[in-house]
Amino acid sequence: MTKIIVGAGITGLYLAYKLIKYKDINPNDILIIEKSDRVGGRIYTYQNKGYKYDVGAGRLGKKQKLVMRLIKEFNLTDKIYDITGDKNYFIDNKLLNEKELLKYYDSKFSSISKLWKYVIDYKSNLDLTKMNFHNYVSTFLSTNEVKILDRSLGYVNEIYRLNAYDAIYTLKKDFDVEDNSFFILMGGLSIIYEKIYEFLKEKNVKIILNCDLLDIDDKNKTIKTNKENYKYSELYLAICKKGYMTIPYFNNHKELLDSVSVGNLLRIYAKYDVKKNKWIKDIKKTLTDNKLQFIIPIDNKSGLIQISYTDDYIANFWNVLTTKQIKINLVKYLKEIFPNENVTEPEWITKHYWCCGAHFWKVGKNSRKIQKQIEKTFKPKKIYVIGEIYSSRQAWIEGSLETVEKLLK
């Protein structure tokens, strides 16, 4: 009988790989359906004008055990390229390094990581699920210390949307607030899913693209898609929240499944003429309080840069602009940071918007209880909810892989 996996992102591919390699499942008994026209989901290495760059998932952490294991398994260790932790901060029209940022906010902490360590280790009697991270830290830190946290993390979703309990957990596990060492993979992160995809193709696993799940009939163990109906013995769902909110089968479970919010993300890559834009030569990763949010250097010598990485309402700001309007605004916001430098419009840009870039446990929701409730509701029907969406490490590949490992234990 067929095990159907819905979603050919890293979660679905990893599950199929594990079922075949470690659970001795016959590859002919696995069917993967994917609503888009490509595999890989939110891992996407884009190719443009001779350049390759990641426009979806951007980085991995050495503390992420499952990711590290996968890299070793596919002999990709030599592709690891460490990211420097050195950053600048553009705050109130001032470009500051870490020491200057701490001094600007009159901090009693000697480093940002020491402030984060204090926050993560702080013991509180409050119910952290009932407030967002910003409100939680405001109960025991000064206004200025809270501003340092806000400015040094930079994300809207993690600070204002995610509940504080899950924010602390993921900050501790996955962010570079406590010297977590991050890296990218040379040639792009897509190599991870491509290796799994190659394995599945060699095993002749059937993968159907442009195949959208429309409904589920758990009595007859059948799924309805835009192509045809398929019978399953077990159904694995690696889909985003929109699927759970629109598929009729889940209508009676909306309150349970609506416990996460959807975080949108947007990356803008730009290629500059380095002779006319001297500012690009020594630019570091820069967190800004203007609409650029994050500036992430890619190749300073050639002039390729991720000129803006944004989330939430800031991502929406850029997404509605035309290419010309984006170029004009890039000049405007860069001139704020480099008022004495010549800043031209980029030669070209590419914009990459993810309406479901990540998911975040809502304020007032107890993630651990909800995870158990989801399992209790669907597991008896041989339906399994997996992926980053309801994981303990949302917005990270590691969260997706953890849900697969937990399922197969």
Residue ranges and their predicted role:
Residues 11, 38, 242:
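Conserved Rossmann-like nucleotide-cofactor binding loop
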Residues 20-47:
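Glycine-rich FAD pyrophosphate-binding loop
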Residues 51-118, 122:
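Dinucleotide-binding Rossmann-like beta1-alpha1 core, especially the glycine-rich loop
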Residues 14, 282, 289-409:
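Conserved flavin/dinucleotide-binding core of flavoenzymes
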